Regions:
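Conserved positions within compact, well-structured domain cores
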Residues: 48-253
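Sec-dependent N-terminal signal peptides
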Residues: 4-13
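Sec/Tat signal peptide C-region and signal peptidase I cleavage site
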Residues: 15-19
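Surface-exposed, flexible loop/turn segments at secondary-structure boundaries
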Residues: 12, 31, 82
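Structured surface patches comprising rigid loops and adjacent beta-strands/short helices at the edges
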Residues: 36-46
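A periodicity- and composition-biased signal for non-globular, repetitive helical segments
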Residues: 8-9, 26, 179
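Short N-terminal segments immediately surrounding and downstream of signal-peptide cleavage
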Residues: 21-35, 55-61
Length: 253
């Protein structure tokens, strides 16, 4: 979306004052172009349709590509937004999105995306925390930290993804991820990285697992996550402790 700012420029002549208008156009890449209004013959605004698989999403300074897998549209990269905090500190509901980076190194967020506790991922919707359930319980899409028009996948949506790839975790892993019987083929285009996680003891694990939060809680008080393992092709699900720091992958509304 273009944000258009109008400024008035006064040009002084010897015998008269001429007022001319200059239009300043701020583009999505944060560059600005100035155009004299008297040079414009025609001004047309076009809404470019979103096409999953070819369109990209620019969000919080990052550009994400998209992929169609079966009936679903996914971001191909893990989210990487927010302010990095130390792995020794819990993320908090402070109106600022916070993330962990493996080994507290920003370069690892650039490579793998950020890691988020569950409550941070769902943005504390309906009073959700890492120790209490939302009230009322979630119904419908949970945008959380995803861009507008996207949301945190539910358990059911992850299950649909798994069914689409015939329960083959290697089809979800990026090429070059995994070893032995767990080598990624990325035939789905999901491009999962073994980004690891932030553990409940504040330590980090990387290169062995890919963990993704769902928005779905479990009756035990945890939240369901989908995960892939280094050395096998399984697609796994488990109700994890919400204080763990996992990757977040968004799905289109």
């Amino acid at each position: 979306m273009k944000k258009i700012l109008f400024t008035m420029v006064f040009v002084l002549g010897t015998s008269a004052i001429f007022a001319q208008y200059k239009m300043s156009v701020k583009k999505a890449n944060n560059t600005t172009e100035d155009i004299w209004v008297h040079d414009i013959i025609n001004l047309t605004f076009t809404n470019v349709a979103f096409t999953c698989g070819t369109s990209t999403i620019t969000y919080a300074g990052q550009t994400y590509t998209t992929v169609v897998i079966g009936s679903q549209c996914w971001l191909k990269e893990n989210l990487n937004l927010g302010i990095r905090i130390a792995g020794s500190t819990d993320q908090t509901n402070n109106s600022t999105i916070e993330k962990y980076c493996y080994s507290d190194d920003d370069a690892n967020c650039t490579a793998y995306g950020g890691l988020y506790q569950w409550a941070e991922a769902v943005q504390y919707l309906n009073g959700a925390t890492n120790t209490t359930s939302p009230s009322p319980a979630f119904s419908g899409n949970v945008q959380g930290i995803c861009p507008t028009g996207w949301h945190i996948p539910t358990y059911t949506e992850f299950d649909t993804l798994t069914t689409t790839v015939s329960n083959d975790g290697n089809a979800l892993k990026a090429v070059g991820q995994g070893t032995g019987s767990g080598v990624g083929t990325n035939t789905s285009g999901f491009s999962a990285l073994l980004a690891g996680y932030r553990n409940i003891d504040n330590s980090f694990v990387v290169n062995d697992y890919a963990h993704f939060w769902s928005s779905t809680e479990d009756v035990t008080g945890g939240a369901w996550g989908m995960y892939l393992v280094l050395n096998n092709s399984n697609v796994n699900y488990f109700p994890f402790n919400k204080t763990l720091g996992f990757s977040v992958r968004c799905i289109k509304d």
